[in-house]
Amino acid sequence: MNAAGGGSGAQAAAVAAGNNSLSHNALLSTASGATTMPMAQLADGWLELESDPGLFTLLLKDFGCHDVQVEEVYDLQKPIESPYGFIFLFRWIEERRARRKIVETTAEIFVKDEEAISSIFFAQQVVPNSCATHALLSVLLNCNENNLQLGDTLSRLKTHTKGMSPENKGLAIGNTPELACAHNSHAMPQARRRLERTGAGVSSCRFTGEAFHFVSFVPINGQLFELDGLKPYPMNHGGWEDSEDWTDKFRRVMAERLGIATGEQDIRFNLMAVVPDRRIAITHKLKMLRTNQAIVSGTLQKLLKADEQGESGNGDSQRPDTPTTLLEPSAFTARDLQSLLKNLDTEIAINEQHLADENDRRHMFKVDASRRTHNYDKFICTFLSMLAHQGVLGELVSQHLLPSKKVSGQGAANRISKQSTTASAGGSTAAGTASTPKTQQQQAAAAKNGKSPSKTPGRRRKGRNKCRKRK
């Protein structure tokens, strides 16, 4: 990925302009194993990808590497089984203070020896928007081939780029049609539209309007290397203790890195691990459990048969021993074997569920990929056109706009009503207060004439009648 004003911008521009295209095309057509496209088209055509483990897993499969998957890491302290490497995504801001601290720290561990650089796969990112593929290849092409089946495309790329400079390796990646097509097949339509509007001069690794960058951490010859395509050299973080795993060294390096980065209150990053396909280990374990289940079940049947023969007095009542492939050569009761068989059945059921869950995850990866890459523009435009043709679009728009107006109108009406009620209440109170002296004068005059104020039943009944009428 290119950061705004990043160091690889000039290189990417040179590639886009097709500089040295003839020599590189002639050199790399063999590496790709296919007829190369014009270099400018390949360099300009790489699209931005989201940081998603499902997307990366499917991308690895499209590269031809089938026995690998990518998982997101949420807890650094949680152990991870047999990782090939880690991919770290962070927001790239060149002038950020924390970024300068990281640069000052990593500059001391640059590996500048050309022979050492040529012995590993380290490629400079000279093609915009290719950082996701660069990060994956930096892990895969530095793994032991005995432990990982790379597939034809990656094997050819690794073979034919051996001994090349980091810049030429970056050009080899950008000029491999299989990699470019697989990469772009997982991009969102927005990424293509953005590329068409702005060109290839600006690069980021997620369609967020900001620059994000991937770097890889991988163990090579007992040393932890950090491979960043925007750096001029690979970085060697050193080895680890004999009693440690390489992931322990990685945790310490990453904890220090995150401590520097989060000092600026910026925690927008994520960490992914490249690991073996979990389904392979589960399938192998299921095979072993089913073999043991068959052995225990067969031994139990023989034991029960021997017990029956012993009780009937026919044949040899000697109990068979459990085969040495499962347990020590000693006699077991039928109850022991039944308990062991029950545990095996439980383990088999658990692992079958785990395998089903992994298969469901792969299915959801494909569903999410279809949703992510599908272009809904035509559907939305056609749908809105049909609504307009039927004359209901304006009504639907009004229905969605009017509620807000109604709410604001009702609020104003409520305020006016409240003010009117308050004014009426105030007027009534004032009127009542004003009539009080007049009522007192009438009562005083009645008392002077010898009449009791209470002897006015007609007026009181009239008031009560009015209340009844109101009811």
UniProtKB/Swiss-Prot annotation:
Site (Transition state stabilizer): 125
Effect listed in the UniProt record for changing residue 131 to S/A: Abolishes deubiquitinase activity without affecting the interaction with Asx or association with nucleosomes
Disulphide linkage map: none
Catalytic activity: Thiol-dependent hydrolysis of ester, thioester, amide, peptide and isopeptide bonds formed by the C-terminal Gly of ubiquitin (a 76-residue protein attached to proteins as an intracellular targeting signal)
Presence of the UniProt keyword Nucleus in the record: yes
Effect of residue 288 to R: Abolishes homodimerization. Severely attenuated deubiquitination of histone H2AK118ub1 substrates
Stretches the record annotates as Disordered: 307-326, 412-471
EC numbers: 3.4.19.12
Residues with site note (Important for enzyme activity): 228
Enzyme class: hydrolase
Biased composition regions of type Polar residues, renumbered to the chain: 314-326
The ULD domain, residue ranges: 375-403
Segments of skewed composition (Basic residues): 457-471
Residue intervals of the UCH catalytic domain: 45-276
Annotated region (Positively charged C-terminal tail required for binding nucleosomes), positions in chain: 405-471
Coiled coil region boundaries: 240-256, 298-324
GO process annotations (BP): epigenetic regulation of gene expression; heterochromatin formation; specification of segmental identity, abdomen; ubiquitin-dependent protein catabolic process
Location of this chain's protein in the cell: Nucleus
InterPro entries in the cross-refs: Papain-like_cys_pep_sf, Peptidase_C12_UCH, Peptidase_C12_UCH_sf, UCH_C
Active-site residues from the entry: 131, 213
Family: Belongs to the peptidase C12 family. BAP1 subfamily.
Subunit relationships: Catalytic component of the polycomb repressive deubiquitinase (PR-DUB) complex, at least composed of caly/calypso, Asx and sba (MBD5/6 homolog). The PR-DUB complex associates with nucleosomes to mediate deubiquitination of histone H2AK118ub1 substrates; the association requires the positively charged C-terminal tail of caly, probably due to direct binding of DNA. Interacts (via ULD domain) with Asx (via DEUBAD domain); the interaction produces a stable heterodimer with a composite binding site for ubiquitin.
Described purpose of this protein according to its UniProt entry: Catalytic component of the polycomb repressive deubiquitinase (PR-DUB) complex, a complex that specifically mediates deubiquitination of histone H2A monoubiquitinated at 'Lys-119' (H2AK118ub1). Mediates bisymmetric organization of the PR-DUB complex and is involved in association with nucleosomes to mediate deubiquitination. Does not deubiquitinate monoubiquitinated histone H2B. Required to maintain the transcriptionally repressive state of homeotic genes throughout development. The PR-DUB complex has weak or no activity toward 'Lys-48'- and 'Lys-63'-linked polyubiquitin chains.
Protein name as annotated: Ubiquitin carboxyl-terminal hydrolase calypso
Lineage, broadest ranks: Eukaryota, Metazoa, Ecdysozoa, Arthropoda, Hexapoda
